Amino acid sequence: MLPRGLKMAPRGKRLSSTPLEILFFLNGWYNATYFLLELFIFLYKGVLLPYPTANLVLDVVMLLLYLGIEVIRLFFGTKGNLCQRKMPLSISVALTFPSAMMASYYLLLQTYVLRLEAIMNGILLFFCGSELLLEVLTLAAFSRI
C-alpha cells in the first residue's frame, strides 16, 4: 500500500533513463579516481611548489566539501531515476550547479593549476553538463505521467 498521494508508474511503462544511469555509474567511478588523484596532486603541490599553507588547506577542505556534494548528487540522481521520482532527481539537478561551480574553481581559480587538473576538471564539467541535460529530459518524461 502506497502512502496517500503517491502513485506508481503504470504497469509496463518504464520512464527511467538508461543513458542517464550509465552516466551516473561512470561519473561515480570517475569521481573516485578524481578525488584520489587530486589529493595526490595537492600533496605534490604542497611539497614541491611554494604553495601558501592557508590556500592549500582551503583547497583541500573545498575538495572534501566537493566530494560530499558529488556523493549526495549522484545518490539522489540515481535514486530519482531508478524509482521514477521527481523530487530526488530535482535535488540532483539543484546540486549540479554547485558541483559545476566547484569544478570550475579547480579548473580556473586555484593558486596553481596543473595541466592534468585542467583535463580532469574539463571531463568533470562535461559529465555535469551531460547529466544536467539528461536529468531535465528525464524530469520532463516523469512529468507526463
From Swiss-Prot:
InterPro entries with a match to the protein in the record: Uncharacterised_TM-17
Cell location: Membrane; Cytoplasm, Cytoskeleton, Cilium basal body
Keywords linked to the UniProt accession: Cell projection, Ciliopathy, Cilium biogenesis/degradation, Cytoplasm, Cytoskeleton, Disease variant, Joubert syndrome, Meckel syndrome, Membrane, Retinitis pigmentosa, Transmembrane, Transmembrane helix
Assigned GO CC terms: ciliary transition zone; cilium; cytoskeleton; cytosol; membrane; MKS complex
Protein's UniProt keywords contain Membrane: yes
Membrane topology value: Multi-pass membrane protein
Annotated TM spans: 22-42, 56-76, 89-109, 122-142
Entry's Gene Ontology BP terms: cilium assembly; non-motile cilium assembly
Purpose of the protein: Part of the tectonic-like complex which is required for tissue-specific ciliogenesis and may regulate ciliary membrane composition.
Protein name: Transmembrane protein 216
UniProt source species: Homo sapiens
